């Protein structure tokens, strides 16, 4: 069975700076999941790809967005992508996803623990991925002539609904 990502995913990137903690949010992504179902429950997932336009991430502050897009090299790398390689369902109903994240043209293998709930016949996946910007060859952005520095540690949190 093929499921499609709902039109309004919730994707949040959180980090720190020398001035304050920050969040950037996107509600724009595309995705497809191929799996086996029993009733309305997924029993196996054979394929899952989610892509988010890099410039859909917004902080609500234009200057911060511009610095982030420059650091992410969005003029060259248009998307952030997750590509599933293997999925294992745990006895507690969670999943272990093994796959790759591609950010700023750099691809890294990741393992994610994902919580799945069924709401209104939709599979809702919630999880997060913490990483260092420098792992993806991203120089943490600075602002105000280098006086405000972004921390290297960031976290992507997501809620994805497939139907």
Short names for language-model regions:
Residues 1-163:
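Low-complexity, acidic/polar, glycine-enriched regions of mature
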């Amino acid at each position: 069975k093929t499921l499609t990502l709902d039109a309004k995913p919730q994707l949040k990137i959180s980090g720190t700076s020398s001035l304050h903690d920050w969040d950037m949010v996107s509600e724009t992504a595309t995705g497809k999941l191929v799996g086996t179902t029993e009733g309305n429950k997924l029993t196996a997932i054979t394929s899952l790809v989610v892509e988010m336009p890099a410039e859909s991430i917004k902080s609500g502050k234009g200057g911060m967005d511009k610095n982030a897009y420059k650091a992410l090299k969005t003029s060259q790398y248009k998307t952030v992508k997750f590509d599933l390689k293997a999925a294992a369902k745990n006895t507690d109903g969670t999943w272990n996803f093994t796959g790759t994240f591609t950010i700023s043209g750099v691809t890294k293998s990741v393992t994610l623990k994902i919580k799945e709930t069924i709401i209104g016949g939709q599979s809702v996946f919630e999880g997060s991925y913490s990483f260092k910007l420098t792992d993806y060859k991203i120089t943490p952005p600075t602002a105000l002539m280098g006086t405000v520095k972004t921390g290297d540690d960031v976290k992507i949190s997501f809620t994805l609904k497939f139907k």
